[in-house]
């Protein structure tokens, strides 16, 4: 592998702006805003709009398309059973 080609990664806190849920992870992105984590250390905070705490797939509140696909809609429109 070539040396010095990989981006530098940092420990950061990701915070869901909708629920306030926070988790610590690694990222190449950093921020000027910081916060103290449970271990007593200070980390940059990156705010996200959707996380596993609020995404419908993970919360079980997802909606399914009950109208059917394009073929089913076409058949229904032209009475082709």
From Swiss-Prot:
Part of the 50S ribosomal subunit. Gene3D superfamilies: Ribosomal protein L31 (4.10.830.30). Keywords: Ribonucleoprotein, Ribosomal protein. PROSITE patterns: RIBOSOMAL_L31 (PS01143). One of its GO terms (cellular component) is ribonucleoprotein complex. Belongs to the bacterial ribosomal protein bL31 family. Type B subfamily. It holds the Pfam family Ribosomal_L31. GO terms for molecular function: structural constituent of ribosome. The gene is rpmE2. The keyword Ribosomal protein applies. One of its GO terms (biological process) is translation. This is Large ribosomal subunit protein bL31B. It comes from the Bacteria. It comes from Bacillus licheniformis (strain ATCC 14580 / DSM 13 / JCM 2505 / CCUG 7422 / NBRC 12200 / NCIMB 9375 / NCTC 10341 / NRRL NRS-1264 / Gibson 46).
